[in-house]
Amino acid sequence: NQLEKTKSVTLRVSKPDMLTVSAQKEELRSCVSGEVDFDITEDDSLHENQCIIETDQRIIDCSLDVQLQNLKDQIRMLTIM
């Protein structure tokens, strides 16, 4: 698991999503090992439903629009075969 190999995880979320995501902080925290620093921060540059995971190794865009595009791509690939 990539998150277990990193020293820190920061979840950057939009202002409209901050309250909802913060309410899930303990559940999200339980997904990483105890030695990893975990934080959730509000990012004014993000729009609603946008979310970025930052570690000391990489940045992952897990925004809803990105996930939907990936889903569409997967469905297209399945129907081409």
Predicted regions and their residues:
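Elongated, mostly alpha-helical coiled-coil "stalk/stator" tethers of large membrane protein machines
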Residues: 1-52, 56-81
